[in-house]
Curated annotation (Swiss-Prot):
Family: Belongs to the GatB/GatE family. GatB subfamily.
SUPFAM superfamilies referenced in this protein's UniProt entry, alphabetically: GatB/YqeY motif (SSF89095), Glutamine synthetase/guanido kinase (SSF55931)
Subunit structure: Heterotrimer of A, B and C subunits.
Name listed for the protein in its UniProt record: Aspartyl/glutamyl-tRNA(Asn/Gln) amidotransferase subunit B
Alphabetical list of HAMAP family matching this protein: GatB
Protein's gene: gatB
Organism: Streptococcus pyogenes serotype M12 (strain MGAS2096)
GO biological process annotation, one example: glutaminyl-tRNAGln biosynthesis via transamidation
Domain of life of the organism encoding this protein: Bacteria
Annotated keywords: ATP-binding, Ligase, Nucleotide-binding, Protein biosynthesis
Length: 479
């Protein structure tokens, strides 16, 4: 029997506000344990939450970016559970009235086609703390993350393969990153993914029993975990077994999933309205204000790059991978840079330098103005493409004018025949044996002079002009 794969994803995105959702503590990542906490985070008796307006702003932006309807009257709920990293014994979340609902995004499949993936809801909530189990037999609780604002984005079960799930996550990450509400860095926990997967016989309308996957710390592991589950569940069903509703984690070392616990249902959390927070009204003016702050998104930019700038689909996709890179590219083109040349540099030398240095493009000294000027002096013959690589490294580290650096460092190409011809004559005088070989008709003897000339000019002779002049002067030797 063959089975159809059904996948839905729950994505937790940490919002990059300065303070937490209900307390004034810093929400910044990387501090010493429990440094970013106060009495609200520790849930001392009598403390009350105070809503961070910036979190609602971010929620509205996310809902708009994901083509969602927005609840004009929004409230919070208590999700009750006990765990050491949750000192209140409940989490403030949203249950029946999330900030956004009925959304969708389009994903691009491997065959080049597109597919719409529906998004059920996006709700705001507070993050929990973090437990660390030490080798000394003790467990430690760090509440720096407690109360950090999250938006949980829940897709419909519209994905039919691990590859579609991967494409959905890639598209979702791009969109959220463009809004500016999160840096979506999985390595820092600001984007976390839980996957729900089930199988059903082809032609059956009813979904099978789902399994939830956790510990998916990269998009690659999401795909690998789902691929493993497809095989595990299909094998179990074909042998007459029954799929239980359970939570499993992906074990990277063993390339498989491991049972964590039997899955709870929503009723186990005993949701009820949060009594310490009011109803929040979101009017059209607020929504319009947030909409005005949104940028043009990747899909629209890719279409523009292909249709207006003549770039390939691949180049357009690479240039829109992050908003910072796309903005950099657009600035360079607006300053007169040739779109294809700017694209080539950003995907070539610039990308290699960033990878080697472990930096992002906004962390280096090369500005779009610097890059455009450098491309221009390559085009006008001031420097060669080979010399440009040296110039680029200097500009990436130090910034400044490309032309000014080239002139100061003595890197300007020699293109003037009045300068090059005497140097060629000196090369002939200094290499009598090579001249004799050439005159005697020795095969490829003329090629040696190119190297001699480049050495004599310390690589600064314009290659095209040099070849032309060499050919003329060698012909005179032959005559």
């Amino acid at each position: 029997m063959n089975f159809e794969t059904i996948i839905g994803l729950e994505v937790h995105v940490e919002l990059n506000t300065n303070s937490k959702i209900f307390s004034p503590s810093s929400a910044h990542f990387g501090e010493d344990p429990n440094a970013n906490t106060n009495v609200i985070d520790w849930s001392f008796p009598g403390v009350l939450p105070v809503m961070n307006k910036g979190v609602i702003d971010a929620g509205i932006k996310a809902a708009l970016a994901l083509n969602m309807d927005i609840h004009k009257e929004m409230h919070f709920d208590r999700k009750n559970y006990f765990y050491p990293d949750n000192p209140k014994a409940y989490q403030i979340s949203q249950f029946d009235e999330p900030i956004g609902y009925n959304g969708w995004i389009k994903i691009k499949l491997e065959d080049g086609s597109t597919k719409k993936i529906r998004i059920e809801r996006a709700h705001l909530e507070e993050d929990a703390g973090k437990n660390t189990h030490g080798t000394d037999g003790y467990s430690y609780v760090d509440l720096n993350r407690q109360g950090v604002p999250l938006i949980e984005i829940v897709s419909e079960a519209d994905m039919r393969s691990p590859e579609e799930a991967y494409a959905y996550l890639t598209a979702l990450k791009e969109i959220i990153q463009y809004t500016g509400i999160s840096d979506v860095k999985m390595e820092e926990g600001s984007m976390r993914v839980d996957a729900n997967i089930s199988l059903r016989p082809y032609g059956q309308e009813q979904f099978g029993t789902k399994t939830e996957l956790k510990n998916l710390n990269s998009f690659s592991n999401v795909r690998k975990g789902l691929e493993f589950e497809v095989e595990r569940q299909a094998k179990l069903l074909r042998s007459g077994g029954v799929i239980r509703q359970e939570t499993r984690r992906y074990d990277e070392a063993n390339k498989g999933t491991i049972l964590m616990r039997v899955k709870e249902g929503a009723a186990d959390y005993r949701y009820f309205p949060e009594p310490d927070l009011p109803l929040y009204e979101i009017d059209d003016a607020w929504i319009d204000e947030m909409r005005a702050q949104l940028p043009q998104f990747p899909a629209q930019r890719r279409a523009k790059y292909e249709e207006e700038l003549g770039l390939s689909a691949y180049d357009a996709s690479q240039l829109t991978a992050t908003k910072v890179l796309s903005d950099y590219f657009e600035t360079a083109v607006s300053l007169g840079g040739d779109a294809k040349q700017v694209s080539n540099w950003l995907q070539g030398e610039v990308a290699q330098f960033l990878n080697a240095e472990g930096k992002t493009i906004e962390e280096i000294a090369l500005t779009p103005e610097n890059l455009v000027e450098m491309i221009a002096i390559i085009a006008d013959g001031t420097i060669s493409s080979k010399m440009a690589k040296k110039v680029f490294v200097h500009l990436a580290k130090n910034g400044g004018s490309a032309r000014a650096y080239v002139e100061k460092a003595g890197l300007v190409q020699i293109s003037d025949p009045a300068v090059l011809v005497p140097i060629i004559h000196q090369v002939f005088a200094d290499n009598e044996a090579a001249v004799a070989d050439f005159k005697s008709g020795k095969r490829n003897a003329d090629k040696a002079f190119t190297g001699f000339l480049m050495k004599a000019t310390k690589g600064q002779a314009n290659p095209q002009v040099a070849q032309q002049l060499l050919a003329q002067e060698l012909q005179k030797l032959r005559d």
